[in-house]
């Protein structure tokens, strides 16, 4: 989790995976940053806001506090990170302790309200709407996407590094499904992957079934539920159920 020792940020750093710069002190903000703070009413959702300086941070956080959208307690625990602009992608993996192999189950991205509604408007209407309504980034679902093949090797490299880091710092390491969530950025004539977040569980998108990646391995696309079932069945056959349980 994000607020415990040796959390996902610790693991990403130890794995050598590129992440946005983290500002532990808002006074140190020196570029466009995104503040991720839990909502007051729904702690499982986060209220995001952008700022480019400490003054900007104070003004925007004060507005959210006055509206009771967030609390002072949660603001103190907020993650402040460099704003990275790119094509958002969630890389949904499955690691099998039985075969010691990493599989890419699929890739997807998020649908967010009211952001998606704003983005679908013509530019002139967007400008008018933004005079009265501020964007929100509340997750409402996912849809499947693909990435170009030249990025697949890099994605697998990140996944393998993360698995190795979990084994080193949290034995027995990650088991089964997890996702590295980030964006593909373009810089100096090449693309790179920046990871913002980690989902250490079954990812929230059933749409990964409709990407081609699991089909390359199995001959047909499979869901996370089916893949977990196959792992349990194999563990029972091998008498190694203990390897996939904690």
Feature roles, as predicted:
Residues 22-25, 51-56, 174:
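Alpha-helix N-cap recognition
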Residues 1-31, 40-41:
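Conserved N-proximal alpha/beta basic substrate-recognition cap immediately N-terminal to
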Residues 32-56:
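Conserved anion/nucleotide-ligand pocket segment
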Residues 39, 85, 200:
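Short, glycine/acidic-enriched loop or turn micro-motifs at the edges of active sites
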Residues 58-135, 150-162, 167-170, 179-194:
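Phosphate-binding site of ATP-dependent enzymes
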Residues 48-53, 94-96, 145, 185:
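Short beta-strand-to-turn element immediately C-terminal to the catalytic PLP-Schiff-base lysine
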Residues 144-246:
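ATP-dependent carboxylate activation and anion-phosphoryl transfer catalytic cores
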